Amino acid sequence: MEKVNQTFFLSHGSPTLSIDDSLEARQFFKSWTQKVLPQKPKSILVISAHWDTKFPSVNTVLRNNTIHDFSGFPDPMYKLKYEAPGAIELGKRVKELLMKEGGMKRVDEDTKRGLDHGAWVPLMLMYPEADIPICQLSVQSNQNGSYHYNMGKALASLKDEGVLIIGSGSATHNLRKLDFNITDGSPVPWALEFDHWLRDSLLQGRYGDVNEWEEKAPNAKMAHPWPEHLYPLHVVMGAAGGDAKAEQIHTSWQLGTLSYSSYSFTSSL
């Protein structure tokens, strides 16, 4: 079994990523196995911002159905399917680790839920064959960054078991501030300032500051009125380890305020 020495945070942006070839981020995700991770993982654990539960939950299904959890988008998007196999054993292993290593009293199993668009849209571009078993893990927006970082620490050993750990969220996420007049891919100043702070903090290894982003970051509440789109980042940071080296693997913008900044975290050997 080949170990996976990296974890990843992916900004999944708008659901239109699934069909809009003009988006730079779409080309980035489509080039994943050529440019980012040629190694094929045994299975994938994806932490998506779009599954928010009171207690940690994993989906344990034989096959993942495709959840179209968005409205008002072009009809072809609702016909897209990404029915990758489930990863029941991985889900049970995640539950075991969160309780044993993470000290969590309760972790739920969902035997019906498939993949929401935070998971299937990027994965459909990255691994279009849909032949890798996938388990999804929820976030808890009633908790904080350190909680999710510690959740990731509890899951770190999965990398040694050939599991690719992906957090899918967004470096900035304020849907009320999207500017449909900006069509040239340029960002507005407040969003860029937050995005640069996040980039610099990660690349300099200041993970403690990122855990306390609500107090430390400029324009924190503007960039993330709600925290759920950043919490997948904390999980993959924790899973990579405190000595992990961060690298920005993509950056682009949509509608002025939506950052596609994405990062890898390479664990120290």
Curated annotation (Swiss-Prot):
<dbReference type="GO" id="GO:0008270">
    <property type="term" value="F:zinc ion binding"/>
</dbReference>
<feature type="binding site">
    <location>
        <position position="12"/>
    </location>
    <ligand>
        <name>Zn(2+)</name>
    </ligand>
</feature>
<dbReference type="Pfam" id="PF02900">
    <property type="entry name" value="LigB"/>
</dbReference>
<keyword id="KW-0223">Dioxygenase</keyword>
<protein>
    <recommendedName>
        <fullName>Extradiol ring-cleavage dioxygenase</fullName>
        <ecNumber>1.13.11.-</ecNumber>
    </recommendedName>
</protein>
<comment type="function">
    <text>Opens the cyclic ring of caffealdehyde between carbons 2 and 3 or between carbons 4 and 5. Involved in the biosynthesis of arabidopyrones.</text>
</comment>
<feature type="binding site">
    <location>
        <position position="173"/>
    </location>
    <ligand>
        <name>Zn(2+)</name>
    </ligand>
</feature>
<keyword id="KW-0479">Metal-binding</keyword>
<dbReference type="InterPro" id="IPR014436">
    <property type="entry name" value="Extradiol_dOase_DODA"/>
</dbReference>
<comment type="similarity">
    <text>Belongs to the DODA-type extradiol aromatic ring-opening dioxygenase family.</text>
</comment>
<feature type="binding site">
    <location>
        <position position="229"/>
    </location>
    <ligand>
        <name>Zn(2+)</name>
    </ligand>
</feature>
<keyword id="KW-0560">Oxidoreductase</keyword>
<dbReference type="InterPro" id="IPR004183">
    <property type="entry name" value="Xdiol_dOase_suB"/>
</dbReference>
<dbReference type="GO" id="GO:0008198">
    <property type="term" value="F:ferrous iron binding"/>
</dbReference>
<keyword id="KW-0862">Zinc</keyword>
<feature type="binding site">
    <location>
        <position position="50"/>
    </location>
    <ligand>
        <name>Zn(2+)</name>
    </ligand>
</feature>
<dbReference type="GO" id="GO:0016702">
    <property type="term" value="F:oxidoreductase activity, acting on single donors with incorporation of molecular oxygen, incorporation of two atoms of oxygen"/>
</dbReference>
